[in-house]
Amino acid sequence: ESMVIIGGSGTGKSVALKCVLGLVRPDRGEILVDGAPQGRDRDAFLARFGMLFQGGALFDSLTIWQNVAFRLLQGRQRLAKEEARAIAVEKLRRVGLRESVADQFPAELSGGMQKRVGLARAIAAEPEIIFFDEPTTGLDPIMSGVINDLIREIVVEMGATAMTITHDMSSVRAIADKVAMLHAGVVQWTGPIADLEHSGDPYLDQFLNGRAEGPIEAVR
């Protein structure tokens, strides 16, 4: 299932992801994944997740294949270099990049290509859960459509659970099964994508229509 979280800047969208990953401790309550708390084996917990970062977060000093295979080369169960490279090349192909890109460095690629590399890295270890943080920010409409299509295809193909943060309503409509509207750290509305346009929720209605008047203050 693909859940998309929408909401204005500073409403807590990225913080929500960081809380799930254990990077930020929630003020109250608890985080359950498949009905269970994080547990003591943090490495095993994090191994269930993949993440596409907003800015790509590629390592400038590593080649593209080394970026994609970064997790595969770490920890107790790290793979041999040759095996990790082969998996990286396979994932690069899956996101539409040729093998010739594998030995280049991030600075040699366009923004759209870097975003694809980030996506390849997010799926390299076959995670159960994938987080996408503003996946189309900074991309032109055509490349945004390409990334949205890839996200949708890969999530369905892998049978993964996906959670995406975005301001881009075209992305919401392209990749969401369900949507959650976050405001001031509170989920104001959640429901299937089919109910988005006629939710009856004043917060969601104001956000979708870009109106200054409504329960969301235009100046924060």
Question: Where are the regions a protein language model picked out?
Answer:
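Conserved ABC transporter NBD signature motif
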Residues: 29-37
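Conserved ABC ATPase signature
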Residues: 105-109, 113
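Catalytic Walker B motif of ABC-type/P-loop ATPase nucleotide-binding domains
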Residues: 130-133
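Conserved catalytic motifs of ABC-family nucleotide-binding domains
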Residues: 126
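Helix-to-loop junction immediately C-terminal to a conserved catalytic motif
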Residues: 21
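Conserved ABC ATPase "signature" region
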Residues: 81-100
